[in-house]
Amino acid sequence: MPQYRSRTTTYGRNMAGARALWRATGMKDEDFEKPIIAVANSFTQFVPGHVHLKDLGQLVAREIERAGGVAKEFNTIAVDDGIAMGHGGMLYSLPSRDLIADSVEYMVNAHCADALVCISNCDKITPGMLMAALRLNIPAVFVSGGPMEAGKVILNGEERHLDLVDAMVVAADDRESDEDVATIERSACPTCGSCSGMFTANSMNCLTEALGLSLPGNGSLLATHGDRKELFLEAGRLAVKLAKQYYEQDDESVLPRSIASFKAFENAICLDIAMGGSTNTVLHLLAAAHEAGVDFTMKDIDRLSRKIPNLCKVAPSTQKYHMEDVHRAGGVIAILGELDRAGLLHREVPTVHSPSLGAALDQWDINRETATEEAKSRYLAAPGGVPTQEAFSQSKRWTALDLDRENGCIRDIEHAYSQDGGLAVLYGNLAEQGCIVKTAGVDENILVFSGPAVVCESQDEAVNWILNGRVKEGDVVLIRYEGPRGGPGMQEMLYPTSYLKSKGLGKACALITDGRFSGGTSGLSIGHVSPEAAEGGLIALVEQGDRIEIDIPNRRIHLAVSEEELAHRRAAMEARGDQAWTPKDRDRPISQALQAYAAMTTSAARGGVRDLSQILGSR
């Protein structure tokens, strides 16, 4: 039977010094026999998704103590991708994921904590903490800060529901008045919480439910609603319970790696495909699987994407629905329930809160006769409609649940938005290791597309060309040297896609990059091209005007240039010597921190994880 890790610092005469320090934090004699639960918070005033978390760590801590544990809170960093977007700050976003994972590992292992509660929310914080939890493999529970309410505004006599992307698009549209732009800017992000659409943050928080590491409603219950408080309290109680199950009952089934198995990762990507989640989730799931020691790859994602339909369409793929609407329709559990009825889910996998996912569905799927009154009540939590930065500040409820699986926010298999899933992996000579497209956001008229390449050596160059009218209908904008190594940091391309929309080209052009896209991106936007340009990928050899062919139904992407010509171009590239596979005429200062990241990172096809052999082998 395993001993509490914390006894390393609390047991025996030789630990008198450590105990003296523990006492200085408030611990007493009786506490040294209890499990020490680390509360990894991520409060910051920089990020609306985290601005309300300041007191929530202590809320969880007090509940841990009531449940018989000792709580010790610490904080990680959190980058706001929306604020960091469109300038050099975005270079730091993906690298911050590794920094967050490392910081959680450092704190938990340095102090020998027994279990972990992860209070996350936004884009890189949830995946960073997820990587850490799977790396540490001690009992862990996730609880996120919750989604933001959708913005609401009256324009031209009509109510519009808004999010961050609307503000970006209208600001670049010369047809919009300054007054309307200002109105939308002030209304788009009305409350604390992660941005209100199915962007990266909300996608990842939904996936923690499918992986079995968070409670029902975690991905969709609004940050402002009083019902969300119970998720935080239950997370604290659950962490103590799981710690005692593992250390006192030798029950390894409660460990993160036992829960997040290969089958659980399959469930997670099936949810992702069904709900049309952010393409960034692919990057993060691959990285999490790597930490868990699970052999889950792009080929698995490709295989499942061919049989999972698109059952939920939310902003940015449509402005009709936001996360508050997903919640009213039953949230993640409802989507999983529809997949389960179609035989597309592994029901037997365990979760932190139920003996199996199947048992959880029976209790929490609001479209089942076995659904509890607690479940029906939880999913009635509605937006309050009052701007606020305060968690749990309102208690408004819908008058009825959205149980319509034919025309509602969440559909059943027979009435799917499309039988083709919301995410797809494309392969071809331009992406031999694969690339990702969010098909849920692609207009059906351009699922098959070809056009001349407009080659840009950076995101900045692409933005300049789009805004200055150099990109025309039918073009394929190609942005390269923005991958994990080439950027470095694999920037998001939300501004280029938003500006294409503002110019009326959102359904008339394609955009391809070895970088990535914001969860707020829609349109024919293909990212994660692997291998990236900096690794010798074919994307580095594309020239202006080359024809690029995209066929999403057949999962194909192809550069229509002869092998002989490509061989000639490759030889010319290699002849550049030390400058081979680097961008021409790009002046971008790179800090030592980012250089270190670039030296160790890998391709998007591997999740952009660290591979130390790349530097150890050079010694």
Curated annotation (Swiss-Prot):
Swiss-Prot/TrEMBL catalytic activity: (2R)-2,3-dihydroxy-3-methylbutanoate = 3-methyl-2-oxobutanoate + H2O; (2R,3R)-2,3-dihydroxy-3-methylpentanoate = (S)-3-methyl-2-oxopentanoate + H2O
Binding site for Mg(2+): 81, 123-124, 492
SUPFAM superfamilies per record: IlvD/EDD N-terminal domain-like, LeuD/IlvD-like
EC number: 4.2.1.9
HAMAP family cross-referenced by the UniProt entry: IlvD (MF_00012)
Entry's family note: Belongs to the IlvD/Edd family.
The protein, known as: Dihydroxy-acid dehydratase
Gene: ilvD
